């Protein structure tokens, strides 16, 4: 709960700064790299979270580890360190992405099929979904042989289940 609140507040603030500096995508990419490292590297997480490690040492470490980042991204990361908020990186990135998607009219769509669709089928599906939603579609394909055939499309909270498994279950229930 706190991570989401902190994440939202900081994401809104840094998104505004990034937008004013025309660095929205660059900052998202940088934050995402830091988040993945935070999730996957226990030593990095421990260093960032450890209360006895001074902020200046953390900033120095950030600048060294992420030296390939542009100065703008490094400044934002150091700001998060200064405010003791780098440990909330997951919430910040999640909220930042929500803002980015909303402002750029992008929607995540999860499509589950029994077999992998061809590139042509994926392109056609994206085209139809973009027409239906009026937004750019970020399509994630999942494979689940249990649905037998057909597909299940999830757009936000809406689920369109056109799987043979659901149809068989409906017939069986009678």
From Swiss-Prot:
Can you name one GO molecular function term for this protein? proton-transporting ATP synthase activity, rotational mechanism
Q: Which UniProt keywords apply?
A: ATP synthesis, Cell inner membrane, Cell membrane, CF(1), Hydrogen ion transport, Ion transport, Membrane, Sodium, Sodium transport, Transport
Q: What is its membrane topology?
A: Peripheral membrane protein
Pfam families assigned:
OSCP
Keyword set includes Iron: no
Check the record and name the InterPro entries matching this protein.
ATP_synth_OSCP/delta_N_sf, ATPase_OSCP/d_CS, ATPase_OSCP/dsu
Q: Which GO terms describe its biological process?
A: sodium ion transport
Where is the protein localized?
Cell inner membrane
Functional summary from the UniProt entry: F(1)F(0) ATP synthase produces ATP from ADP in the presence of a proton or sodium gradient. F-type ATPases consist of two structural domains, F(1) containing the extramembraneous catalytic core and F(0) containing the membrane proton channel, linked together by a central stalk and a peripheral stalk. During catalysis, ATP synthesis in the catalytic domain of F(1) is coupled via a rotary mechanism of the central stalk subunits to proton translocation. This protein is part of the stalk that links CF(0) to CF(1). It either transmits conformational changes from CF(0) to CF(1) or is implicated in proton conduction.
By its UniProt entry, which HAMAP family does this protein fall under?
A: ATP_synth_delta_bact
Protein's name according to its UniProt entry: ATP synthase subunit delta, sodium ion specific
Taxonomic path: Bacteria, Fusobacteriati, Fusobacteriota, Fusobacteriia, Fusobacteriales
Please state the gene responsible for encoding this protein.
Answer: atpH
């Amino acid at each position: 709960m706190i991570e989401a609140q902190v994440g939202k507040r900081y994401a809104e603030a840094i998104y505004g700064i990034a937008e004013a500096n025309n660095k929205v995508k660059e900052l998202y990419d940088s934050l995402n790299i830091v988040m993945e490292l935070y999730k996957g590297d226990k030593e990095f997480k421990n260093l960032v979270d450890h209360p006895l490690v001074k902020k200046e040492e953390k900033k120095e470490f950030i600048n060294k580890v992420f030296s390939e980042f542009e100065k703008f991204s490094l400044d934002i990361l150091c700001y998060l360190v200064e405010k003791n908020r780098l440990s909330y990186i997951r919430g910040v990135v999640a909220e930042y992405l929500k803002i980015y998607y909303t402002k750029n009219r992008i929607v995540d769509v999860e499509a589950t099929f029994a077999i992998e669709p061809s590139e042509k089928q994926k392109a056609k599906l994206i085209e139809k979904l973009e027409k239906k939603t009026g937004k750019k579609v970020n399509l994630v394909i999942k494979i689940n042989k249990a649905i037998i055939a057909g597909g299940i499309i999830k757009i936000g909270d809406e689920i369109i289940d056109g799987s043979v498994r659901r149809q068989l279950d409906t017939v069986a229930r009678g």
